[in-house]
A protein has these predicted regions:
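A short, N-terminal "cap"/entry segment at the start of jelly-roll beta-barrel domains
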Residues: 1-23, 34-37, 68-71, 108-129
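Conserved hydrophobic/aromatic beta-strand scaffold that supports enzyme active sites
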Residues: 14, 24-28, 46, 67, ...
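A generic "binding-loop/recognition-motif" signal
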Residues: 20, 42-43, 53, 82-83, ...
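Conserved short histidine dyad/triad with adjacent acidic residue
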Residues: 25-43
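Short beta-strand His + acidic residue motifs that chelate non-heme Fe in jelly-roll/DSBH
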Residues: 36-38, 56-58, 78, 83-90
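Glycine- and acidic-residue-biased ligand/ion/polar-headgroup-sensing regions
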Residues: 42-55, 59-60
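A short hydrophobic beta-strand segment most commonly corresponding to one strand
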Residues: 46, 77, 91-108
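Short acidic-glycine-tyrosine-enriched beta hairpin
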Residues: 60-80
């Protein structure tokens, strides 16, 4: 069982929560699923991919949209204020470490955005029947 469900719908497993300036969790997204698109108000994250394959969409203010393919060993940064969305490949769960600075302040940190950059059918998005 996950420790929490993130505002984007992914599963969260706490690894380090007692640090003062950062936090570390493992994030999991089931095979074939797509997260809800969100942006963070105050935190920056570094993601290190452990297992699975997938895609990550990002759009930072004043910059072009970008979609990156990810696999074990991939690393990327989610800067403060950038909209993002991620998707697990069709065959395996996507798992990554998420280092957050400052530490995750709570669900109010994530702000829903009106669109994402990964096209999904209604049953692929997390939280959909």
């Amino acid at each position: 069982m996950p420790d929490a469900i993130a505002p984007d719908g992914s599963e969260i497993y706490f690894l380090v929560g007692d640090a003062r300036r950062a936090s570390l969790v493992e994030v999991r997204l089931a095979a074939g699923q797509t997260s809800k698109p969100v942006r963070h108000r105050t935190v920056e994250e570094i993601w290190y991919f452990l297992a699975g394959e997938g895609r990550v969409w990002q759009q930072c203010p004043g910059e072009a949209e970008e979609v990156k393919e990810v696999a074990p060993g991939s690393v990327l940064t989610i800067r403060t204020g950038c909209a993002f969305q991620f998707q697990a490949g069709p065959r395996t769960q996507l798992r990554f470490l998420c280092y957050t600075s400052p530490p995750w302040p709570g669900d109010q940190e994530a702000e829903a955005v009106t669109h994402g950059g990964i096209a999904v059918s209604g049953d692929e998005e997390v939280g959909q029947p």
